[in-house]
Amino acid sequence: MPLRIKLTHRGPLIGSPELRFNAGLLFGGTIPKLHNDDVEFSFGWGGAATGDTSLAFLKTMAVAKDVNEFMSTMETMTAEKGYRGMAANIIMADNSGNIAYQQAVPMFRRKDETPYLGCRVLDGRTSEFDWTDEIVPLTELPRAINPEKGFISNANNRQAPDNASKDYGATQMSTGRSVRIDEMIRQGIDSGKKFTADDMIAI
């Protein structure tokens, strides 16, 4: 039996009770009447943008000589059309001891620079909240080079402060897990521990 999918300029329509229920779990507090049978949602996803460059970025990661080269190459590659690839939290290190983090995600700007740049349900009856064709540059996304604390960890958690000018997404809810990872690493550092691969697996 063929599956009929309705498409809009924003993306496919989500109309099934199951999909609406799952959307309600994530976005239920943001709009009224989420479970109304007459409501359909168009689902926009930056990862569906044309011109995926994921493989090119993976190659860049593999051949970069150091952290600075990798970061500058990424900026150059995305200067014109923005980052168009799989969403990723990229953590890197080089032989000189430099470390860095870059959030890489195809995040489109909205008209009038509204703060709703992440996963939010908005009124689709108007084009007011539509994306523009511009992707937010990597330099405006969360990043760090040689942070003062001396290490970088990530557990798909929120990387931006609460007063950040942009909404970086509703799905990065693992902050508690990340805090615990940081605690365990700090405890090891304070005790003079030399971490091994097995230690990282245990954490």
Q: Language-model segments: what does each one mean?
A:
Residues M1-I203:
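Mature extracytoplasmic enzyme cores
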